[in-house]
């Protein structure tokens, strides 16, 4: 997942739009209690899906309790299935994900599946970041996924052999839906007025995935919505319109987002000069980073009650190789430990997921891994292994 261009745009636009921010500053008094059951994990699809025989042993060595994996609807269902709620429908290809969950079980790691990416047949042959035309298609896919990874589904390997697939109980609805890289467009003009289309569509995406997962009849699954980008400009006329996370949460509620089991967020700092404890510099912040995550907790509580908060993506890049966005290797390890401590002190935070095991090779990508692209180990590897959980 490349965020270099995203962060440059968001930092620039947030400086312009700061005065028009929609966030309400507040720190929940509960944040000082310890989160004793917080799951700690890693998100690195190239390692877990691309080279899983290497990726999963590394996860085990890092003592990861959970791995986030993108379950791409478009790749599983390149063609419309005849019986969409049946995980054995021949239109579906789950092979990559079956392999991942089997290796996760072998290494005693839980899986968090994030459903995203609309198939061409479901949105008029447009980009994967365009919402489905009929949200029932997405709901049916979520049901099929939950059934396949219910813990009781047997994959038929041959006429005489079957494989019992492990259970997946944790699910995520989309990725950064307030960011046009993942859900577009964010705004649309309707009858002369701007509609926050991203939030409108996401309310339906979340409802569909929640209903599909819980409708499978497993009974112990949990579905998180949100997975929001920490920034947003709230400027529909801008070249790269996006919606700030608190505004997106409120708008999703207004447009009919009914329920979820947890709210997920990605509280990245905007610049390497800002530590995990730093708060947004603007008096009325549009962003939600780790230092002011209490603002998000308070708003979720106001709108939906005391739902858990999941940090499903976080990290600091290093220099080398990243001279602009990176911190030193030593500082990355220190910030990792600090960010974990901040999250763990907040009893509402139930999950903390670091982004990347290994750096992406292209500099336009992301370099927050515990290893460089060439395999050199950073001090953050040891820091992550030493996290107390």
Regions found by a protein language model. Name each.
Residues 56-61, 70-146, 192-226, 285-286:
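Aromatic-lined substrate-binding rim segments of carbohydrate-active enzymes
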Residues 52-53, 139, 143-169, 190, ...:
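Noncatalytic carbohydrate-binding groove/subsite architecture in carbohydrate-active enzymes
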Residues 9-18:
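Bacterial N-terminal signal peptides
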Residues 29-66, 70-72:
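Boundary/entry segment of secreted carbohydrate-active catalytic domains
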Residues 39-44, 65-75, 110-115, 169-173, ...:
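Structural recognition of the beta-strand scaffold that forms the well-ordered cores
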Residues 75-94, 118-140, 157, 164, ...:
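Surface-exposed, active-site-proximal loop segments in enzymatic domains
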Residues 167-172, 177, 182, 318-389:
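Aromatic-rich peripheral "rim/lid" segments of glycoside hydrolase catalytic domains that contact
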Residues 32-35, 56-63, 99-110, 162-163, ...:
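Acidic (Asp/Glu)-rich catalytic clusters
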